[in-house]
A protein has these predicted regions:
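N-terminal beta-alpha supersecondary unit
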Residues: 1-66, 141
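Acyltransferase
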Residues: 183-234
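Phosphate-handling active-site elements
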Residues: 48-55, 83-93, 206-207
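Stable alpha-helical structural segments in soluble proteins, enriched in small hydrophobic residues
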Residues: 46-50, 85, 103, 192-205
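Surface "functional belts" at beta-alpha junctions
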Residues: 22, 89-189, 216, 221, ...
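DPxDG-like acidic metal-binding loop motif
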Residues: 61-90, 95
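Residues at secondary-structure transition points
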Residues: 30-38, 69-73, 77, 94, ...
Length: 234
């Protein structure tokens, strides 16, 4: 199964072509939130390197959140535009789960964290072993200070913090656990390849592109400010 994977849910962006779990081609950019300029050229690049066109793609995979509201919208809009002409089925994968797949051969507890600002992180905990990833907690937006409590039951296991919020998570938990570390730089960020692997390894459902929806976990800053303004006016 030829898959086009995409990620633009945070600071980095990536695109990948896989044949099942096997990586064929990949592009990765860490240049800030310029995804509207970089994502489609990366798709063209990975397709060209793989000597494929969108007509050859059996399924598209996109990280559907949590993360940057703008980045998520750009990614979902891009994958819909790419998939609709050929009615290619699509699959949305948690950004945090895609991160965990970076560590699937590490035999560890993956503390996946993204900087959600306001002293919070988007986080989920996974157990990685023998190439498999087992979800232990649901994706959530939480204060980083809650992580030691969440991870307490895994205190005797090796814990690796991964994601663009990994340093925040690490600072929150390093004094509570003996065996906690940061992921290597090369595996620090979510990748389109990880999202594609998750979809394949877990036999996720592929749906019509029009049915793809973003997963934000919390209202946007503008929505929160509007809600606060309304409450003050009541």
């Amino acid at each position: 199964m030829k898959i086009l994977g995409l990620d633009s849910s945070a600071k980095t962006a990536s695109a990948a072509i896989t044949d099942g779990e096997q990586l064929i081609s990949e592009a990765f950019v860490n240049a800030g939130l310029t995804h509207s300029e970089t994502l489609l050229p990366m798709v063209d690049s990975v397709l060209s390197l793989a000597r494929l066109t969108m007509a050859d793609i059996d399924g598209c995979v996109i990280t559907d959140g949590p993360g940057s509201f703008t980045g998520i919208r750009i990614g979902i809009a891009a994958v819909k535009g790419l998939a609709m002409p050929n009615e290619t089925k699509c699959c949305g994968v948690s950004t945090l789960k895609a991160m965990a797949y970076n560590l699937r051969y590490d035999n560890c507890i993956a503390c996946c964290a993204m900087d959600a600002r306001c002293s919070q992180v988007y986080s989920a905990i996974f157990r990685c072993f023998d190439g498999k990833v087992e979800r232990l907690t649901e994706d959530d937006a939480i204060p980083a200070s809650k992580l030691p409590e969440i991870l307490e039951k895994y205190a005797n296991e090796r814990i690796i913090c991964v994601g663009d919020g990994a340093h925040i998570a690490y600072q929150a938990v390093k004094d509570s656990f003996k065996s906690v570390s940061l992921a290597q730089d090369s595996r620090h960020f979510q990748r389109a390849y990880g999202a594609a692997c998750a979809a394949v390894c877990e036999n996720m459902d592929f749906i019509p592109p029009a049915q793809l929806l973003p997963v934000y976990l919390r209202p946007s800053q503008a929505e929160r400010e509007l809600s606060l303004k309304k409450s003050h006016n009541q």
